[in-house]
Amino acid sequence: MSPPSQPTGTIDRRPAPLPEDSALELALAAHGIPTPQVRKLVRLAAAQPGDDCAATLAHALAQLYLFNPLGVTAGRFFFVGAPGVGKTLAIAKLAAQAKTCGCAVRLVTSDGARRVGIDQLRHFATTLGIEIEIAADTAALDALDVRTGAVTLIDSAGINPYSPSERTALEALATAARAEPVLVLAAGGDPADTVETAHVFRDLGCQRFIVTRLDIVQRLGSVMAVPEALGIAFAEGLSATALGQGVETFTAESLAARLLQSR
């Protein structure tokens, strides 16, 4: 039986079909981005004038997601995440960037349980000519004075996001720190696992996230899944290069360029 014809005088509101296997669709799918998200981006990009793929994709990204870099010229930030995602190196890179901009920087670690974490941050701090402060419990964090004109970067121990006791302990530290919690995620993970992890930290108050290991992964599906599912904002992206390098401010344009890079 033939499908019923469209009634005369009505408007067909179905979305126009996409070109089969469009170059943009293939490029996004190669990152492991779920098909519904890919097609949403492609439709928004196709609605833009012009044939500059990077520009139309950037416009689509700006419509769908938030971009809110830390900037690290001022403020008080408490960095959180799972073990091994690169929080300490991320903090050191952001500190180096702030120093380069002529900003006063304060480095604090609340990771009192891991000597290696303290030693790693101290090594980076020495390179930058900064003394670190250790505030390993809620009382010590609560006692930290607020320094006007300085950016304060606070490291924390990585936690198992599925451990209620570890989540509770981290939440207490974050509250005592009186700082904005910022999620640090490593690129290259499974998208579903990454979203589940990010969901836990969003519930702890994170509204922005930093991505590490951008230079050693080829697929950004997990990175793209987080703002799609949770609505938190892209902040900075980091590469494991020299301490004073490898900090990228996420914008719709820079993300579009990364998604379209040939691999």
Predicted regions and their residues:
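Short glycine- and Lys/Arg-enriched binding-loop motifs that mark or flank ligand-binding interfaces
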Residues: 77, 154, 236
